[in-house]
Amino acid sequence: MRVVIQRVNHAAVRIDGETVGQIQKGLLLLVGLAEGDGEEQVVKAADKIAKMRIFEDEAGKTNLGIKDVGGQILSVSQFTLLADTKRGNRPSFVHAMRPPKSSQLWEEFNQELVKRGLTVETGEFGADMKVELENDGPFTIVLDL
């Protein structure tokens, strides 16, 4: 499982011009699920993200978590995070989990975040989406589990 975590001032995801999810201050999560991932990875990722201190306090130190700042999450499934680029010029996605299992696990991940008291908006699994965001920092972390 790979999650790209971006601290944002605001973010939105649109499908065919219609906004399906949007947040103000918070985290944009790009979520890639690999073959072999399961509940263990989903729970660990949700715990880590819920507790991660990546927002600045009054002193400018990254001491605050998303709940501390009243932030929201926009979760977007993105299988291309599992691209293998070692050979040739065309990325291979053989390590990415296939639907419908990947869709189910992404939904479980989002529910784990909600269980931890977080507000979660989402894109739509498998859709052609346009993601708009304003990075804060920029502050980006890649979480591999």
UniProtKB/Swiss-Prot annotation:
UniProt short sequence motif Gly-cisPro motif, important for rejection of L-amino acids, positions renumbered to this chain: 137-138
Matches recorded under Gene3D superfamilies: D-tyrosyl-tRNA(Tyr) deacylase (3.50.80.10)
Keywords, comma-separated and alphabetical: Cytoplasm, Hydrolase, RNA-binding, tRNA-binding
Catalytic reaction annotation: glycyl-tRNA(Ala) + H2O = tRNA(Ala) + glycine + H(+); a D-aminoacyl-tRNA + H2O = a tRNA + a D-alpha-amino acid + H(+)
Keyword Nuclease among record annotations: no
The protein's Enzyme Commission number: 3.1.1.96
Main localisation: cytoplasm
CC terms in the record's Gene Ontology section: cytoplasm
Compartment(s) of residence: Cytoplasm
Gene Ontology biological process terms, A to Z: D-amino acid catabolic process
Coiled coil segments of this chain: none
Highest taxon listed in the record's lineage: Bacteria
A molecular function (GO) term: D-tyrosyl-tRNA(Tyr) deacylase activity
Free-text comment on this protein's domains from its UniProt entry: A Gly-cisPro motif from one monomer fits into the active site of the other monomer to allow specific chiral rejection of L-amino acids.
Similarity section: Belongs to the DTD family.
Role summary: An aminoacyl-tRNA editing enzyme that deacylates mischarged D-aminoacyl-tRNAs. Also deacylates mischarged glycyl-tRNA(Ala), protecting cells against glycine mischarging by AlaRS. Acts via tRNA-based rather than protein-based catalysis; rejects L-amino acids rather than detecting D-amino acids in the active site. By recycling D-aminoacyl-tRNA to D-amino acids and free tRNA molecules, this enzyme counteracts the toxicity associated with the formation of D-aminoacyl-tRNA entities in vivo and helps enforce protein L-homochirality.
Subunit details: Homodimer.
Annotated protein name in UniProt: D-aminoacyl-tRNA deacylase
Organism: Lactobacillus delbrueckii subsp. bulgaricus (strain ATCC 11842 / DSM 20081 / BCRC 10696 / JCM 1002 / NBRC 13953 / NCIMB 11778 / NCTC 12712 / WDCM 00102 / Lb 14)
